[in-house]
Swiss-Prot record:
This is D-alanine--D-alanine ligase B. It comes from Bradyrhizobium diazoefficiens (strain JCM 10833 / BCRC 13528 / IAM 13628 / NBRC 14792 / USDA 110). Gene3D superfamilies: 3.40.50.20, ATP-grasp fold, A domain, ATP-grasp fold, B domain. GO terms for cellular component: cytosol. The gene is ddlA. Mg(2+) 2 binds at E328, N330. Pathway: Cell wall biogenesis; peptidoglycan biosynthesis. The lineage of its organism: Bacteria, Pseudomonadati, Pseudomonadota, Alphaproteobacteria, Hyphomicrobiales.
Length: 376
């Protein structure tokens, strides 16, 4: 692999994949771990990889193995001593240096693979930059990314489409709701409080009293100016489904998996997901009646379409007896060694290497369809 755009082989030129990771987000560390796993999964006979690390303050760096990244790493690193680079608008993947001889050539990429979780990466911001650069990229475009990232907007769209969602309300930093009003509106004193635009359970907590609610809101407002308050579902099972869009536009759902958290964790928190090795178990396939499992797969595809997702998404559900609720869709799901999205496809017969090929093929096909549109 090379840091700057790859080399020509005698037989054919490899595809240069720009792997974007890190980011200005509370999910920065998760992104670095996801990127390491994707780097291992990409077929080195087919792809050269241009590692683009985005620092916590939003700067882009050209990273290579000398900066601590590599196929044996559990998480890729970003050195602020690496060359700082930028993507050229309309440049079809061309990159330039932003330090030293500013504007000098820094190579190019054929396709971008943004594995950026949370704000400033999963919310349509980077997708907009990639569209302006006129380069193919993996995953949803601006609309689907922005819609799925905002929990309030996505839940309203799903509810309006007749999809089952958990009762919720939103509150903002400028018009905060009191605990008593939230209890009255949602019909229960047992509530979950979440930042509206974040994932990986960052900033999420449970509240069963006025004091806990105040603390939960204070925590969530550290990460977002809008927060979601949801009715807690006691005893609900957490079921997940991976959705993949082929280059032809065909959409299919994987088999289902279940998250079974350890008893000491009150819910599937960031700690349970990424810190505690025994925080949760992944059961694949999920033990569900056949008809219910098929219904969840159908719902996952419906959610994918309603939220304008493209390429891939992981759709999460709550199952309480015969009742099913859609929790959310993640347009850039985790790709760590313990992440459900790639594991579900592996269990469905699609290896991670083949999954990478399909995601990249979709990126190229979607870009060609977009370029065929008239903008004049």
């Amino acid at each position: 692999m090379t840091a700057y755009g790859g080399e020509m082989t005698k037989e054919r030129r490899k595809i240069t994949v720009g792997l974007l990771f890190g980011g200005r987000s509370a999910e920065h560390e998760v992104s670095r771990a996801s990127a390491a796993n994707i780097l291992r999964a990409l077929n080195s006979d087919r792809y050269d990889v241009y590692l683009i690390g985005i620092s916590r303050d939003g700067r882009w760096f050209a990273c290579d193995s000398g900066n601590g990244a590599g196929t044996g790493s559990t998480a890729l690193t970003i050195s602020d001593e690496a060359p700082e680079i930028g993507l050229v608008p309309g440049g079809r993947g061309r990159l330039v240096h932003c330090d030293g001889p500013t504007g000098s050539d820094a190579g190019s990429i054929d396709v971008a693979f943004p594995i950026l979780h949370g704000p400033n990466g999963e919310d349509g911001t980077v997708q907009g930059a990639l569209e302006l650069a006129d380069v193919s990229f993996v995953g949803s475009s601006v609309t689907g990314s922005a819609v799925a990232m905002d929990k309030e907007v996505s839940k309203r769209l799903m509810r309006d489409a007749g999809l089952p969602v958990v009762p919720f309300l939103t509150t903002t930093a400028s018009s905060r709701i009191e605990y008593a009003a939230a209890v009255a509106a949602l019909g229960t004193p047992d509530l979950f409080v979440k930042p509206a635009n974040l994932g990986s359970s960052v900033g999420v907590s449970r509240a069963r009293s006025e004091e806990e609610f105040a603390a939960s809101c204070a925590l969530a407002f550290r990460y977002d100016r809008k927060i979601l308050v949801e009715q807690a579902l006691n005893g609900a099972r957490e079921i997940e489904c991976s959705v993949l869009e082929e280059s032809t536009g065909d959409i299919r759902a994987s088999g289902l998996g279940e998250i079974v958290r350890a008893s000491e964790h009150g819910f599937y928190s960031y700690q349970a997901k990424y810190i505690d090795a025994d925080g949760a178990a992944l059961h694949i396939p999920a033990d569900l009646p056949l008809l219910q499992a098929r219904r969840l797969q159908e719902l996952a595809v419906e959610v994918f379409n309603v939220l304008c997702c493209e390429g891939m998404a992981r759709v999460d559900f709550f199952v309480q007896g015969d009742e099913v609720f859609v929790n959310e869709a993640n347009t850039l799901p985790g790709f760590t060694s313990s992440s459900m999205y790639p594991k579900l496809w592996e269990a469905s017969g699609l290896s991670q290497t083949d999954l990478m090929d399909k995601l990249i093929a979709h990126a190229f096909a979607r870009h060609e369809r977009r370029r065929a549109l008239s903008f004049g």
